Amino acid sequence: MAGLVNRSQHAPPRRRFKAVLEICGVLAIILSLGALVLAQSSSKSLPYQALVLTAAIPLPGVHGRFDHFAFDSAEPGRLFLAALGNDSLEIINLTGGARVHTITELGHPQGVVFASGLNKIFVASRDHQKLYIYDGAAYRLITAIDYHGDVDNLRYDAAAKRVYVDYGDGEKAAIGMVDATTNQRLADEYKTGSHAESFQLAETGPEMYVNLPQQSQIAVINRVTQAISRWPVTWKENFPMALDEADRRVFVGFRIPPRFAVFDMSSGKMVGALPCAADTDDLYYDSELKRIYVAGGQGFISVFQMKDPDHYELIANVPSGLGGRTAGYPRQPGKKGGPPHLFVAIPDRTGHGAEILSYVPVPSE
């Protein structure tokens, strides 16, 4: 860490844990209001503006918090947003910058992925405990798979055409798989021992990296042999995660305390950490600019610059909005070959409706 530059009793365990997290999140936001003003003021003295706000897409009639994004990179480009508090999936045309469709009655949707070659949308429903599969053209329901447990984060392996499904609690918690072509649930699954939050699939190997906040661990699962190793972590509520496979690094966001942490992918050793935006739920690694974007419900995006794989620097705290912890950063270039965009979903608040903010990264000079 020296190398980094500063800057209800009878409810199911998963529900109790979620309730505690939501209470903690609210308290964190309240306690962070003063810190937000300070962070925004101090960011003005940083070298340059790391992100430029280019658009705000309104979402009238959408209420409550958001969970996750997915993207369709084909022209004109679509954004899929799980509006958890609104029980809906909001679909945005990125060229027109407007909502084009809403799928309703999803029962607190959480994870969402889009299978581009198959034109299918997969949506995880927490309350219905199901994985819904929709046709991506007509938005028609194809089928639903019942997991009999909290269905949360999803990941899509485009090469294998498989959707990875994080579901369940305690001993029943696992990451299962669905054949995206046949829409069939596969028998194989990976037991995690507790409900997982963000997990990432390595592209250069069989590993899957999994945040397990209830156990204060990061699990590394070999998808071929099913062997599992576990890294203990010092802080609490490790939720978002991103990978830098070229430099063998795992980036993790913690909520208690608010920290951006870097782990060696081979050893599991934490090589450093820095304070970041509170109440984070998404973070992304920009391999071209060597940056990490950490979105926090505190109301800003912490931007970190990699100096080398062991050294990072906070270069900006970019204002967004209270509750803006849901973000998306598609790897593909923006529309018509333009720059990529960082999208942040902001819930509705007094005097202002829900919206999606779009930022363009600004390279350092």
Locate the predicted segments by residue.
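Predominantly soluble domains enriched in secretory-pathway, periplasmic, or organellar proteins
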Residues: A35-E365
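Helix-centric, low-specificity signal for extended rod-like, repetitive segments
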Residues: R7-A11, L33, P58
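Intrinsically disordered, low-complexity segments enriched in glycine/proline and serine/threonine
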Residues: P12-R15, L21, G25, S43, ...
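Bacterial N-terminal signal peptides
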Residues: I23-A35
